[in-house]
Amino acid sequence: MLRRAGVLEDVRRAGFVPKNWSFRKADGTPIVTIEDFAPSKSPDATTVLPIDTLGKILWCHALKNDHISVRWGCHVVDVGQDKDSAWVSVRENGGTEKIIKADFVCGCDGAASQVRKSLFGGEFRGKTWTDQMVATNVYYPFDEWGYDDLNTLIDPDDWHIVARLTKDGLWRVSYRQDGSKSLREVLDEHPARFEHLLPGHPKPDDYTILNISPYRLHQRSAEKYRVGRICLAADAAHLCNPWGGLGLTGGFADAIGLSECLIGIHMGRADHSILDKYDEVRRAIYWNFTDPISTSNFMRVSTSDPETILEKDPVMATFARMHEDSKIREDFDRVCSHPNIFVDLASLSQHIYGILHDFTQYYSTGKGQASL
């Protein structure tokens, strides 16, 4: 998807390809390690890059396109439409309200989307998990404690993730916190949580935190992703917990699919009904793939007994057998190298659903080659 958008080379230069992925007990003891999980030799290898840096890269590319304008400081108040156009009512810095009109409005305004609320009110089908997650970016020498680039720590009470973010030693540590805790309580308890969870049991002077962000975990989807000339995509359309990275990936897939539909309409190769297909397909992918897979990933980390997980969890058992079974390893590399598929890792060679979908197949003159 990033290659198609023309930004992959910049992303690769700014980020890095991670090496090993380890599943561990809460105290850091390894359970199983997947070496070179990216895999590094694939042209579609996993690349790690902080989201704020990715945003800057995308913004710089947008500025080079004469057909794109970026307006800062605009708060969406409402949306509307008639048979010929759609519009967004925004409040600019200073309080001035303005109407921005176009052929279509695409609401990509995040989990608290005002576009979605204008269409459906407070309706957002799904659930919120009991636990909350506290995401932090921190400088701490995890390498000295034998941690890999990606570490998933399994425990019903102390589940957390430790992942290298940058080449200069910045790490993401995200950990469980009681969902009933207030922001003040989360911040007050944070030093004790770090001392308990991190290797070496550090004190605040032993690490440098750049930011700390508690947030709730959700599994939710809007009733529709298309209402007339107004469409929803990414977090504005659906939410999932972060285990597996399906939120950001699904958002990219939405953007690719919606752009194909709008390009088809613009080129005269599709009518507006292709947007109904976008709504139908993307919602089906959320409910049939993103929601169950991300839920399964979260349950594996948050409810499993780390002492028995290799015996009871077929996915973890498969990971463990990779060291001895070259066929499983080959299947894993093949799947991870393919940009369009995900698999049930309990049987790595089985494709269960594609998170991408080619909407150019619905063009009236046959399958086209639409580009972003």
UniProtKB/Swiss-Prot annotation:
The keyword Oxidoreductase applies. The gene is terC. Keywords: FAD, Flavoprotein, Monooxygenase, Oxidoreductase. It comes from Aspergillus terreus (strain NIH 2624 / FGSC A1156). FAD-dependent monooxygenase; part of the gene cluster that mediates the biosynthesis of terrein, a fungal metabolite with ecological, antimicrobial, antiproliferative, and antioxidative activities. The first step in the pathway is performed by the polyketide synthase terA that produces 4-hydroxy-6-methylpyranon (4-HMP), orsellinic acid (OA), and 2,3-dehydro-6-hydroxymellein (2,3-dehydro-6-HM) by condensing acetyl-CoA with two, three, or four malonyl-CoA units, respectively. 4-HMP and OA are not pathway intermediates, but are rather shunt or side products. This is FAD-dependent monooxygenase terC. Induction: Expression is induced by methionine. Nitrogen starvation induces expression of terC and promotes terrein production during fruit infection, via regulation by areA and atfA. Iron limitation acts as a third independent signal for terrein cluster induction via the iron response regulator hapX. Finally, expression is under the control of the terrein cluster-specific transcription factor terR. It is an enzyme of class 1 (oxidoreductase). InterPro entries: FAD-bd (IPR002938), FAD/NAD-bd_sf (IPR036188), RIFMO-like (IPR050641). Belongs to the PheA/TfdB FAD monooxygenase family.
